[in-house]
């Protein structure tokens, strides 16, 4: 069995676009993946056809280690764009393998390790501006069954917080904590905004809210700084979504710079490399919680990884807070119920692209909203129905 055809599909999802891909074998089996890289989807699509396609056509889909390892070796300059294209292909290969073996992908990755897959909500704060708004949105999310919520309370801060910015952030966190009570987990997103000193000071002020973790308190590529911040604070630290290579994750884990590793399966090489990262983390008693802020095919890959990974902790969930047509982009897929994920027992990933719905939402060029000016907060806190 060889890969005979390579296709890509761009579709809009409000503020961003999703890039799906499909591989077809000479025996007629198909596999789908996702290569969405926020606000760079057309660039990734070009890489898919001008660089990846020639390296995947004619290859045996079962030869994942050789095929994907060879592409990672051959990329030379590296980076998120090309690794996203490679990652999407890797997931599509697993989809083909699962269908060929008549097994869901998670069973090929080690089998079931968990009875259920807890989710934490992200994007739940649509339309919120004030502490009262955040309180109301938080209660709505908990009413859907979520037992953990993530949000960035820091506005447009960069490196340091003024006293006013610090107080405003703490007021937002306090409002959400009061609204949901002590039994709901809060993940505080920093987006790598702060200097090490300001991050430590801010995390100490957050201790009274007992967050599950503080995410990217400093720039995540500065792994030494992450480790230093972790040593000086009592709160758990999470990071990893903006790391891409096995060497990056080895350093992150060996320095014990985090308590939770957040690899993004869509950007770090796919499922097999993510399993290797999780195994390294397990040796250090570090848990994993995959980042996933893109579409339904990427989420499906995460869930197969989660179910088969012993040190999995909790899965990020935008699914119920995305555009209304999100789940219609694929067939056979509605994976969340009352704040937890579940997987169908279908072969492969368990879903297929719906080309009709995809074509109804064509690509729209959007500009990346900088996290350090007012546009990002305005855009990301719009209600999805307004997009």
Residue ranges and their predicted role:
Residues 1-32, 36-37, 320-327, 380-382:
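Structured beta-strand/loop patches that form or line metal/cofactor-binding pockets in enzymes
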Residues 24-101, 382-387:
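Metal- or metallocofactor-binding catalytic centers and their adjacent structured scaffolds
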Residues 3, 28, 52, 89, ...:
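Conserved, mostly hydrophobic/aromatic
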Residues 50, 66, 204, 210, ...:
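Shared catalytic-loop signature of beta/alpha-barrel
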Residues 90-127:
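Glycine-rich, aromatic-flanked loop segments that form ligand/cofactor-binding clefts
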Residues 116, 120, 124-233:
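Metal-dependent enolase-superfamily TIM-barrel catalytic cores that perform enediolate-based chemistry
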Residues 349-387:
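Extended hydrophobic packing segments that form well-structured cores
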